[in-house]
Amino acid sequence: MKQKLLILIVLLIGSTMCFAQPLVSYRFEERSLSLGGGYTNMLDTYLSPLKYQGAHVSVLGERFTQTQAESKRWFTQSLFYLHGDYATPRSGSGLTVSGMADYSYTSYYKVAAKGEQFRFYAGPQGQLRIGGIYNLRNSINPAQLKLGVNLAASAMIKYVFTGWHIPMNVRLQADLPLLGIAFGPNYGQSYYEIFYLGQGKGCVHMTALHNNLSLRSNFSYDIQLHPCTLRLTLANDLYQWTLGRQHYRMFSHSVMVGCVKDLYHVGREEEAKKSIPY
């Protein structure tokens, strides 16, 4: 009798789980990797009073995640942007190379959604930039370290549609730094004095809109193919500092091509695809 009762309980639990499967919650995640190149224009008065122009290559990795399985309003985004530049002045007598690594983490709230097509997101963003510039023309102080941390505001607009029976979407994202901290030597101050002699007072600066008016924007176009979604991105990055009497500005414009992969961490994939939260 007890064995029959146990079997009945197991069967009831199993049948309940089977019927409940379509209602199992899930957490959606989108990952992408893009490669590209374009044009750069930079000025760093610590190294040279001249403007340098040249080639720009970049790698962009993104992770866009739904924070909770039950929530369709809160999302997080992690962006890793690795880029390098090779530039010369207008005269052609000189060369500057640079390499930067940018990381940002954003907490997005879906402010508005019009049907299943239009979505608008906004939220705070933390930014970290580290890298360096090397001027082959200089014999004294040929290099410049770039290090900064920012609190920024980010906004994203996304429009989903179908063309030629293929799911597509366009997306525009813009990030504006508001407050931060940056490292930069003072006028005439060498890195030998800062790191070897320990005379680094005044090298850490507070930044805001008055001395760090920067903007990063990405316009992307996604075409859903198999086994992944094709992403075409137009990336623009305007970054400038005025620290003490030193001015730094870098503007880059690049075209990128990449692949997007959707992941479903919990629940059944076919059910999740029917109601992607963003």
Question: Can you annotate each of these PLM segments?
Answer:
Residues 20-73, 276-278:
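Short glycine/proline- and aromatic-enriched beta-strand/turn motifs that initiate or cap beta-hairpins
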Residues 22-29, 66-75, 110-120, 162-169, ...:
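Short loop/turn motifs that connect adjacent beta-strands in outer-membrane beta-barrel proteins
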Residues 29, 51-60, 93-103, 118, ...:
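Residues that define the transmembrane beta-barrel architecture of outer-membrane proteins
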Residues 31-41, 76-84, 122-132, 157, ...:
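Transmembrane beta-barrel strands of outer-membrane/channel proteins
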Residues 43-52, 85-95, 138-144, 203-207, ...:
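Extracellular loop and loop/strand-boundary signature of outer-membrane beta-barrel proteins
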Residues 59-68, 101-109, 124, 151-159, ...:
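Residues on the lipid-exposed face of transmembrane beta-strands in outer-membrane beta-barrel proteins
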Residues 140-227:
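Outer-membrane beta-barrel transmembrane domain signature
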Residues 173-175, 183-185, 201, 205, ...:
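Predominantly the C-terminal beta-signal and adjacent terminal strand-loop region
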